[in-house]
C-alpha cells in the first residue's frame, strides 16, 4: 500500500484527531505486519510531533501522558491486551543522540523487529541507516501559532 494524505490543522485538537485516525487504521490492520509498524515523524522543533502522538495513543487506551522522551530517548507504553494484538507502543526521540550507533545500544533492532510493537520515531533521519524503507512518514510544517500542515505517506 502506498498512499498519501495532506491536512491543514487549525488547533492541537485537530492534529490529535488526525493522529487518532491513523492509530485506528493500524488497529484495524489486525497486526498483519512482519515487523513493527514504524511511524517516522519529521518536522522542526515545536511543529506538532508530540501533540500528534498524544492523539495517536488515545485509540490504544494508553493512560500515561505522552511527552517527548528527549533525554531518555526511548519510552515504552503497554497497550491493553483486550484492545489489540499489539502489546507495546514505543516513542523514540533521536534529537539528542550523539551518534547514530548509540541507538543500537538501546535495543532498536529488537524493538523494530517485533511485530507486537508499534514504533514512533522523532528525528528518524539521524538513524536512517538502521531503519527500514517502509513505514508511515508524517511530516509537520509550522504555518502559524496553531496552524500546521501535516503530510502522511503510508508505505507499508
Put a short name on every predicted segment:
Residues 1-25:
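N-terminal pre-Walker A segment at the start of P-loop NTPase domains
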Residues 1-5, 99-103, 108-156:
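Short phosphate-coordinating micro-motif centered on Lys-Gly-acidic
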Residues 2, 25-36:
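Phosphate-binding P-loop
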Residues 39-41:
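Hydrophobic anchor at the beta1->P-loop junction of P-loop NTPases
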Residues 45:
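The conserved Walker
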Residues 49:
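Conserved lysine of the Walker
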Residues 62-77:
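Short beta-strand-centered segment that lines the nucleotide-binding/catalytic pocket of NTP-utilizing
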